[in-house]
């Protein structure tokens, strides 16, 4: 059953409404126009769409001192395919990820925070496919 009602004249066809992770098989055929259109033998191909859309950046990132550690908190993202969060400590122009796997909770305690005058943090969201969001706004904490 053809996806397009009439032959197309370009070498591009967009099939919309597909499900990520499901494999689709296509049979592309050349059609010679005429009173009785002739179809050539088809070329088969498969495609499996993937989610490449990252979640939104986390909002409301805050940091506060808790003794020698720094607590970083943020608001939960609402995406249905959210996999977790990454927390980064920013020192100079270098951002270092502090967690090895995405965090499920919306809080992180940086127990190894260096004793600097200023430290900044940002948080990213990661979806189930591993797409990572843009960084949140930085939260900067100043040593008292």
Where do the model's predicted regions map?
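Short beta-strand segments within Ig-like beta-sandwich modules, predominantly Fibronectin type-III
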Residues: 3-9, 98-104
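Hydrophobic beta-strand residues of extracellular immunoglobulin-like
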Residues: 13, 61, 72-73, 108
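Beta-strand-rich modules
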Residues: 13-37, 110-132
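Short coil/turn motif common to extracellular beta-sandwich-like domains
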Residues: 20, 65-71, 118
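Extracellular fibronectin type III
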Residues: 31-55, 127-144
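Short beta-strand segments of immunoglobulin-like
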Residues: 59-65
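Conserved aromatic anchor
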Residues: 68-82
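Short beta-strand elements bearing conserved aromatic residues within extracellular beta-rich modules
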Residues: 85-87
